[in-house]
């Protein structure tokens, strides 16, 4: 009996020893102290235990008191550390090099599944761009569920929503117009970017006022112990950055800026070939400027000030001809942002950030004509949006739950349209009324992780006061759950209820910055989106695969009755030009990623259908969305040809195959009734055939977006060289956009009895040189 009792005691002791122990910690960048997303925590045999979230946190259970693990992330040195149960530890990983690396597109999902993706600037350097610029906003375009707008542009349409339903934030500041030169590339200098997170489902509740996706760009913390800088040159831009300390380990700074070379290049070309051989004057400009000042007051308190701005301008003045009308066209847009923040971190488990920011986004379009007999006339249009906000965000950890909560107070000023009509110096300016709205929000969210499941939930309450002083209340929900079935296999589900308090009236579908932004009101209520996602994932240290399906329902959408209305001079107001409706989208998404070895890359495929329904459009019948692309296939690959201590060379190859977008086309002509007094008005004067045709012939159009353009096919190629010297690093990138020189159709039209195709881009080579010190 005594022996049996002893045996039970021994077994009880052993069972107690093998009971699962809880491990948790946080992983940061050693140089910038930024949280690292997607760092894998591996056993020494390579089995994955956990992956860090968008705050750099990880947690898991394992049946030992201490455990030796490997911390692994692309672009960082692997590190072996020892974890101890019940203790929250912080680790810092050393970047492989201080400069950005030329790597392929191998972003790290902040969680497994097709809903959250974290990445750094190094992860986007392999994407070929028209400007040759490293562009942090290019990465979302190669993910599943994302459809591109205009070829080469930055507009993207996520799971059936519009380009204006996305939200882009720079350190929590919304940036309404985040692109340069009609959307060719973003306004964010690559040197200022630390980690970025792109969310399509299970979205954080700390951000609101959108119904599609959230792109959060976090800037780097300036270096506190050394000075670093860069200079870069490409065909379109010249730029540089500098960072360092004013007081070592206390007061640090970073400045960065870029400017377009198109205007100097045009003037040089005109000088070389002769002014007489170039017709007109062409003046494109693009600039961006960034500055950050950080003061580490103590281990617990820090202050930060941020300044950001961008400016775009384009004008064309044709050559003057005798007795001919000359039209000067100009347009431009600006972004201005200021932010001051205080960060209080009394412990590793508690932080409070309070900030105030101001943003100003404005657009202008003008056309001035020198008519016959010296008559001058012009039309100028513009819009602007200003926002002032106060925000406080608390994060903490209670037992196994990571919690976040806060408040968000915003006041917005919209001026949707300003018109100035000028004839012979007499100006008639129509300042459309400014609309002031207020949004007060309270939010809370939490993440609970266990070995066999993880649950994330968030709630956001908004009190919205429209410009008519009408108050409405809305509650957003953000839910995500994952259930591992084995160590590598699992399932994930999300639900999101989202609300947006502004409408974006898109003109030409190119994703540029001249779309009209108008506030929600009693007549045009806030937009809502409900989205469900269910999928599975399989992941090893080298390979990950995700497959899932989504359904999204959108309400209170707005659209022009005719997109030509935005260019009309006879508009009473924008309210009379638009109508409201709803949309639906559903599809399957596949994401495959290889992360290790000399050959790395990714593949994404989307099979989807998206429709819109407006009572005043298409006879009230549902019709395909303009960017309802049934099939979207993106393949990215990178091969490391040379890797030594002083040299690196990489070959990148990317392929794109998608269904063409849809459009409405003319399908027939028929004879119309003769206009009243038409013969009288002709008065015996010979009328040009084209004018006669339009007066007596009518065109029948197809149903809305009934025609689908041919498939979009593109192949990009790139090669990069990197040389490390004692004090400087040189990097040369060569890329060829559209190697096949395929003329992909942007639209088709019928002219002079023939169908014609408009294509925007052919083959475009580019070179970018960069030096870092």
Language-model features, listed with the residues they occupy:
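C-terminal beta-signal and adjacent terminal beta-strands/loops
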Residues: 265, 656-696, 709-716, 720-773
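Surface-exposed extracellular loop regions of Gram-negative outer-membrane beta-barrel proteins
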Residues: 313, 362-364, 413-422, 487-532, ...
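Transmembrane beta-barrel wall of Gram-negative outer-membrane proteins
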Residues: 236-259, 275-313, 330-352, 398, ...
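Flexible loop and strand-edge segments within Gram-negative outer membrane beta-barrel domains
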Residues: 282, 302-348, 352, 360-386, ...
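Periplasmic N-terminal accessory/gating domains of Gram-negative outer-membrane beta-barrel systems
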Residues: 75-77, 87, 111-203, 220
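Gram-negative outer-membrane beta-barrel transporters
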Residues: 449, 551-553, 576-662
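Structural signature of Gram-negative outer-membrane beta-barrels, strongest in the C-terminal barrel
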Residues: 308, 400, 404, 408, ...
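Outer membrane beta-barrel strand-and-loop segments of large Gram-negative receptors
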Residues: 387-391, 430-443, 521, 525, ...
């Amino acid at each position: 009996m005594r022996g049996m009792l002893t045996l039970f005691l021994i077994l009880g002791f052993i069972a107690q020893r093998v009971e699962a122990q809880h491990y948790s910690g946080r992983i940061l960048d050693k140089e910038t102290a930024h949280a690292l997303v997607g760092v894998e925590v591996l056993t020494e045999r390579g089995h994955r235990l956990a992956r860090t979230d968008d705050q750099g946190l990880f947690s898991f259970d394992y049946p030992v008191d201490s455990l030796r693990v490997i911390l692994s992330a692309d672009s960082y040195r692997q590190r072996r550390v020892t974890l101890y149960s019940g203790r929250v530890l912080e680790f810092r990983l050393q970047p492989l090099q201080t400069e950005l690396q030329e790597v392929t597109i191998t972003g790290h999902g902040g969680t497994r599944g097709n809903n959250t993706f974290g990445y750094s600037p190094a992860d986007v350097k392999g994407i070929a761009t028209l400007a040759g610029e490293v562009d942090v906003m290019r990465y979302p375009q190669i993910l599943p569920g994302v459809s591109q707008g205009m070829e080469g542009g930055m507009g993207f349409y996520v799971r059936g929503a519009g380009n204006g339903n996305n939200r882009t934030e720079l350190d929590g500041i919304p940036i309404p117009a985040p692109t340069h030169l009609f959307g060719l590339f973003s306004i964010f200098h690559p040197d200022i970017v630390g980690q970025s997170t792109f969310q399509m489902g299970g979205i954080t509740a700390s951000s609101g006022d959108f119904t599609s996706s959230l792109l959060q760009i976090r800037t780097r913390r300036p270096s506190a112990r050394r000075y670093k800088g860069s200079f870069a040159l490409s065909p379109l831009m010249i730029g540089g950055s500098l960072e360092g300390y004013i007081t070592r380990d206390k007061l640090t700074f970073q400045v960065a800026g870029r400017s377009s070379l198109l205007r100097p290049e045009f003037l040089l070309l005109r000088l070389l070939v002769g002014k007489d051989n170039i017709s007109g004057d062409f003046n494109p400009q693009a600039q961006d400027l960034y500055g950050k000042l950080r003061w580490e007051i103590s281990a617990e308190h820090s202050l930060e000030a941020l300044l950001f701005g961008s400016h775009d301008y384009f004008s064309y003045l044709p050559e003057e001809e005798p007795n001919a009308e000359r039209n000067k066209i100009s347009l431009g847009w600006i972004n201005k942002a200021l932010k001051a923040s205080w960060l209080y971190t009394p412990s590793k488990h508690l932080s409070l950030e309070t900030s105030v920011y101001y943003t100003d986004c404005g657009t202008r379009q003008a056309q001035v004509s020198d008519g016959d007999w010296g008559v001058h006339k012009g039309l100028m249009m513009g819009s602007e949006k200003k926002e002032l906000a106060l925000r406080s965000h608390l994060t903490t950890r209670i037992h196994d739950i990571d919690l976040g909560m806060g408040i968000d107070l915003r006041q917005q000023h919209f001026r949707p349209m300003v018109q100035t009509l000028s004839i012979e110096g007499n100006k008639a300016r129509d300042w459309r009324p400014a609309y002031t709205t207020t949004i007060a929000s309270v939010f809370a969210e939490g993440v609970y992780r266990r070995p066999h499941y993880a649950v994330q939930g968030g709630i956001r309450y908004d009190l919205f006061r429209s410009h008519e002083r009408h108050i409405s209340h809305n509650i957003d929900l953000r839910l995500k759950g994952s259930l591992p079935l084995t160590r590598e296999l699992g399932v994930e589900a999300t639900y999101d209820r989202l609300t947006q308090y502004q409408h974006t009236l898109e003109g030409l579908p190119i994703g540029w910055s001249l779309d009209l932004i108008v506030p929600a009101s009693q007549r045009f209520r806030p937009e809502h989106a409900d989205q469900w996602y269910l999928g599975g994932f399989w992941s090893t240290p080298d390979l990950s695969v995700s497959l899932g399906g989504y359904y999204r329902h959108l309400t209170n959408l707005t659209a022009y009755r005719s997109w030509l209305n935005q260019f009309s001079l006879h508009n009473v107001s924008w309210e009379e030009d638009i109508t409201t409706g709803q949309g639906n989208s559903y599809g399957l998404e596949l994401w495959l990623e290889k992360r290790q070895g000399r050959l790395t890359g990714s593949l994404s495929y989307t099979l989807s259908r998206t429709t819109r329904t407006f009572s005043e459009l298409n006879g009230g019948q549902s019709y395909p969305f303009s960017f309802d692309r049934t099939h979207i296939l993106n393949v990215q690959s990178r091969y490391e040809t040379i890797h030594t201590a002083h040299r690196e060379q990489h070959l990148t190859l990317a392929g794109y195959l998608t269904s063409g977008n849809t459009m409405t086309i003319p399908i027939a002509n028929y004879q119309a009734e003769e206009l009243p007094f038409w013969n009288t008005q002709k008065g015996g004067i010979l009328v040009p055939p084209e004018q006669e045709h339009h007066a007596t012939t009518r065109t029948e159009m197809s149903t809305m977006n009934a025609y689908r353009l041919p498939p979009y096919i593109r192949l990009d190629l790139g090669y990069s060289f990197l040389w490390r010297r004692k004090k400087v690093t040189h990097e040369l990138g060569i890329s060829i956009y559209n190697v096949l020189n395929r003329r992909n159709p942007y639209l088709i039209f019928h002219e002079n009895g023939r169908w014609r195709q408009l294509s925007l881009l052919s083959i475009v080579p580019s070179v970018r040189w960069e030096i870092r010190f």
